[in-house]
């Protein structure tokens, strides 16, 4: 997605060889027009996949996921990273390691928001090592439902996430694929 790549080049900051800061339009301040366009790209790519729900992991995946769900006229479910007292234990849970934060968390899905016949589209802001996406997929599989695909806003292609997901048979569609990060340098996959 050329517009997204341009925004990354104009406003993104490569803080290191693995960390890209895009907080001016994606994960702190959000550009709703850009998120709408991102939703359009995901809707168009996954339109033949018979999606029944859009899932995302709190919190930075929410904006692109809600725009995708809105355009597909589907419900969106937010997978929780922290235990909630209102879920009352009627949940699916899996442990996920956060690459960004360097810690483990319990990814949680209420059983009432997924059915065996669901065909789930997982949307996330970043793909690096693939741990978050795999965790979301584990919850979907535990419920007996199917992962129809994974929509990623920004993929760090130099990390193993895509290969791990594709090796497990998932259809991964990324809007911006980064080949290399260095302090002050961002290069895309050609």
Curated annotation (Swiss-Prot):
Family: Belongs to the purine/pyrimidine phosphoribosyltransferase family. Xpt subfamily.
Predominant place of localization: cytoplasm
SUPFAM superfamilies the record matches: PRTase-like (SSF53271)
EC number: 2.4.2.22
Reported function: Converts the preformed base xanthine, a product of nucleic acid breakdown, to xanthosine 5'-monophosphate (XMP), so it can be reused for RNA or DNA synthesis.
Protein name: Xanthine phosphoribosyltransferase 1
Transmembrane segments: none
GO MF annotation list: xanthine phosphoribosyltransferase activity
Keywords, in A-Z order: Cytoplasm, Glycosyltransferase, Purine salvage, Transferase
GO biological-process terms attached to the record: purine ribonucleoside salvage; xanthine metabolic process; XMP salvage
Annotated positions binding xanthine: 20, 27, 156
Higher taxonomy: Bacteria, Bacillati, Bacillota, Clostridia, Eubacteriales
One Pfam match: Pribosyltran
UniProt subcellular location: Cytoplasm
Pathway terms, separated by semicolons: Purine metabolism; XMP biosynthesis via salvage pathway; XMP from xanthine: step 1/1
UniProt: 5-phospho-alpha-D-ribose 1-diphosphate binding residues: 128-132
Quaternary structure and interacting proteins, as annotated: Homodimer.
Natural source organism: Clostridium botulinum (strain Hall / ATCC 3502 / NCTC 13319 / Type A)
